[in-house]
A protein has these predicted regions:
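Short acidic, Gly/Ser-rich segments with clustered Asp/Glu that frequently serve as metal-coordination loops
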Residues: 44-48
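Short beta-strand segments at enzyme active-site cores
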Residues: 38-40, 74-79
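Acidic/proline-rich low-complexity IDRs
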Residues: 10-12, 16, 54
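A short alpha/beta connector and helix-capping loop motif
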Residues: 51-67, 72-75
Length: 209
């Protein structure tokens, strides 16, 4: 009886592993040279309608500062910039990014963006910005279908309405995106307090809103 019971458990576990292979595969510690920070549509005419937008900008800047420090590449997308304005100066500053303009909601419909991902052989993409339930959702779903690991820091993304943001976040997590936070991802990229950059990373972490 014990053998039969254990066999049933093993069969259920095998079934679980098969059905959730994407979730398990995505549960890897980030490597800097395989990771891209993607900042989606943080534009002048969009941002101020977003719930808690100042906190979102604050956390995106923390991710930017960390990625610059650790040599993680950064890409920015802009949705119809002629109509919706350019990316906020607070995000751009004097930093060098890869820029991609788009009309489609999903960044993945931009062939130049897809070529960029392929060129640098990214395996992990941290996606932040706005809006969670439109451009971020469609981008992440498309990227997941390309077998990429997608990480979504909940405190660095948002929508105009809380219900849209929360519902999209749940769908993304169920679809295989890895739910996380800004601080967690910063520490995951840094990995150890023994590295030379940790002192500066620690300052970023201690910065309060």
């Amino acid at each position: 009886m014990i053998y039969i019971y254990e066999k049933k458990i093993n069969l259920k576990m095998d079934q679980f592993l098969k059905e959730n292979s994407r979730l398990i595969k995505n549960n890897n510690i980030l490597l800097e040279n395989e990771t891209l920070l993607l900042i989606v549509d943080v534009q002048e005419k969009l941002i101020k309608n977003i719930k808690d937008y100042q906190l979102i900008i604050f956390n995106i800047k923390k991710l930017i500062d960390t990625c610059k420090l650790l040599n993680v590449r950064i890409a920015i997308t802009e949705q119809n910039p002629l109509k919706l304005g350019k990316t906020l100066d607070a995000i751009i500053e004097n930093n060098e990014y890869s820029y991609f303009e788009k009309m489609e909601f999903s960044c993945s419909k931009n062939m130049n963006f897809i070529k960029y991902i392929s060129e640098y052989n990214f395996k992990n993409i941290i996606v932040c910005g706005i809006e969670t339930h439109i451009c971020i959702l469609q981008t992440c779903i498309d990227l997941l279908q390309k077998d990429l690991n997608i990480l979504i820091p909940r405190d660095a993304m948002g929508s105009r309405h809380e219900i849209d943001n929360d519902t999209a976040f749940i769908r993304l997590a169920l679809s295989g995106a890895v739910a996380s936070t800004t601080e967690s991802l910063i520490c995951e990229l840094c990995k150890t307090s023994s590295r030379k950059e940790f002192k500066e990373v620690s300052k970023i972490l201690k910065t309060s809103f």
